[in-house]
């Protein structure tokens, strides 16, 4: 592999460790009181007989001989890549080597699938050094395989036991860490001493709570998207004739859209959670944006930038109801529907077989969106929401609203989707440092035999030296949700809180940004220079923690 000049410099970057975990000879774990989940306590306690109710683990000053015990540790990188994953591995590896030179680290290839296929590599110092502070998950690859069936759990147990592993780290989002909790329970129930620890990863930012201030990768992804949005905003005020509709990743939550809005001050940003809370209709969304387009036209501002979260359509009550009925219809009448080839006939068939209210919603959708709702199905037969061109949908309904009003306004929409661009960028200094500390924390938790925990670090708005590290039981974050027709234990996703400080701040600025040229241009992620340019966390985190 040929290296760019930046790549060479990033390999040399030395993340700062929080002071209180830097000296492993003088640390131990202080356990808090027993814990419980916020909801579904009875169901979860029955499913996790050996790991439910574990205490929170605080890393404190003290002595613990187990820190130097011999560890054979495995890990997986699970789900979509997020910037900083390689530094989690680097922190874990460095901790293991400091604990005992006899320690071993193995990476299973392509996520949990590598555990099931027994496909792994030994991680060496040379291999780690080639990946420090780099983006992506290419060190061992990632995957979305879940360990769900009894046969799969037995296979995982067989392969992990055969490799004589006594520790496993699962780097992933809510689903992956749910799997980590289930594996911790399975191994404990079968008498294994293998310790399972999770690490919070997701660019979507929806794996957070009172214990986890942010998931890694969110910082880098938001800054990457914000650079691109800023570039487009500069183009908008240069050309002065385009309305840019930009979809950003975030199917289940609008954290990325909100953070990007806080960083760039666009003309308008839709927040899915607000749409759901206000029970906004398609017509109301169109009307709100059309009002802005028309008012800006009166000021000679025939341009603008609108940010849209990827999962918007699932938060619009009438469209959500339509999707549910479409899923049921196309599941139960799949054979009958498959014989219809013309879209007009498909549309008529659908409207005849769903409720009157949903039929009205379906008829009012732009044809390209209606077709996507019918044609794009996921492996479970459901509408593939992430494939819907939401940005085109929004600009389409806005254009229709302007036409309906009979007002002649220049309106030339341009569409963008920023997704994969943010997943594998060189991690920001924040993510590089945060991930290294997460990996080091994972080492401490597994060395001190604290299974069923997920790494957590608090005080992230402060300098890294002052961060406080520890572990929180995975089961404390769980609830029961319906998945594929069955109630399953899952870690609850964190949505944007409309009463939270980040949204309230945006809400206070929204009218000002909509009516004027008030764009901000963040520029590219900076790695060298003043701390206020290079090391600042997201505005979301600063607003939440200050």
Curated annotation (Swiss-Prot):
InterPro entries in the cross-refs: ATP_PFK, PfpB_PPi_PFK, Phosphofructokinase_dom, PKF_sf
Cofactor: Mg(2+); Mn(2+)
Gene3D superfamilies: 3.40.50.450, Phosphofructokinase domain (3.40.50.460), Phosphofructokinase, domain 3 (1.10.10.480)
Subcellular location: Cytoplasm
Alphabetic keyword roster: Cytoplasm, Glycolysis, Kinase, Magnesium, Metal-binding, Transferase
Primary enzyme class: transferase
GO cellular component, as recorded: cytoplasm
SS bond partners: none
One GO molecular-function entry: metal ion binding
Presence of the UniProt keyword Magnesium in the record: yes
Active site: 204 (proton acceptor)
Chain positions of site Important for catalytic activity and substrate specificity: 175
Functional pH dependence: Optimum pH is 6.4-7.2.
Pathway(s) per entry: Carbohydrate degradation; glycolysis; D-glyceraldehyde 3-phosphate and glycerone phosphate from D-glucose: step 3/4
Origin: domain of life: Eukaryota
HAMAP family tied to this protein: Phosphofructokinase_II_Long (MF_01980)
SUBUNIT field: Homodimer.
Name recorded for this polypeptide: Pyrophosphate--fructose 6-phosphate 1-phosphotransferase
Organism for this UniProt entry: Entamoeba histolytica (strain ATCC 30459 / HM-1:IMSS / ABRM)
């Amino acid at each position: 592999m040929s290296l760019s000049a930046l790549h060479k410099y990033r390999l040399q970057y030395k993340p700062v460790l929080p002071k209180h975990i830097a000296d492993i000879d003088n640390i131990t774990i202080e356990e808090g009181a027993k814990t419980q989940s916020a909801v579904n306590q009875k169901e979860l306690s029955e499913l996790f007989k050996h790991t439910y109710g574990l205490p929170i683990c605080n890393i404190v000053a003290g002595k613990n001989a187990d820190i130097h015990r011999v560890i054979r540790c495995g890990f997986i990188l699970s789900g979509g890549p997020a910037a900083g994953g390689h530094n989690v591995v680097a922190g874990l590896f460095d901790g293991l080597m400091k604990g005992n030179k006899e320690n071993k680290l193995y990476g299973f290839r392509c996520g949990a699938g590598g555990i099931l296929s027994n496909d792994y590599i030994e991680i060496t110092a040379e291999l780690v050094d080639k990946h420090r502070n780099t983006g992506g998950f290419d060190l061992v690859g990632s995957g979305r395989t879940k360990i769900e069936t009894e046969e799969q759990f037995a296979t995982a147990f067989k392969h992990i036991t055969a490799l004589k592993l006594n520790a496993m780290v699962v780097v992933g989002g809510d689903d992956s860490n749910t799997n980590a909790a289930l594996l911790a329970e399975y191994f404990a129930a079968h008498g294994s001493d293998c310790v399972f620890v999770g690490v919070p990863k997701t660019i979507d930012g929806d794996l957070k709570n009172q214990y986890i201030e942010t998931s890694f990768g969110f910082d880098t992804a938001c800054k990457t998207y914000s650079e691109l949005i800023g570039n487009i905003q500069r183009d908008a005020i240069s050309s002065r004739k385009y309305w840019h509709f930009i979809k950003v990743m975030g199917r289940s939550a609008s954290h990325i859209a909100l953070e990007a809005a806080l960083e760039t001050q666009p003309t308008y940003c839709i927040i899915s959670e607000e749409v759901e809370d206000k029970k906004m209709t398609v017509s109301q969304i169109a009307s709100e944006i059309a009002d802005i387009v028309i008012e800006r036209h009166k000021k000679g501002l025939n341009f603008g930038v609108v940010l849209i979260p990827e999962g918007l359509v699932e938060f619009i009550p009438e469209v959500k109801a339509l999707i549910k009925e479409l899923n049921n219809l196309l599941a139960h009448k799949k054979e009958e529907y498959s014989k219809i080839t013309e879209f007009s006939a498909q549309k008529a068939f659908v409207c005849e077989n769903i409720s009157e209210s949903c039929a009205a919603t379906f008829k009012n959708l732009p044809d390209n969106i209606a077709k996507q709702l019918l044609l794009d199905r996921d492996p479970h037969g459901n509408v593939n929401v992430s494939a819907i061109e939401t940005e085109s949908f929004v600009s389409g309904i806005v254009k229709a609203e302007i036409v309906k009003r009979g007002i002649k306004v220049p309106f030339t929409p341009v569409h963008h989707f920023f997704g994969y661009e943010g997943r594998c960028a060189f991690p920001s200094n924040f993510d590089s440092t945060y991930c290294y500390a997460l990996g080091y924390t994972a080492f401490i938790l597994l060395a001190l035999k604290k299974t069923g925990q997920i790494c957590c670090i608090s005080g992230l708005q402060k300098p890294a030296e002052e961060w406080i590290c520890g572990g929180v039981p995975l089961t404390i974050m769980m609830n029961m949700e319906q998945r594929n027709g069955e109630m399953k234990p899952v870690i609850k996703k964190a949505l944007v809180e409309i009463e939270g400080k980040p949204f309230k701040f945006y809400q206070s600025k929204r009218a000002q940004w909509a009516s004027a040229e008030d764009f901000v241009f963040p520029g590219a992620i900076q790695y060298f220079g003043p701390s206020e340019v290079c090391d600042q966390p997201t505005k979301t985190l600063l607003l939440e923690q200050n």
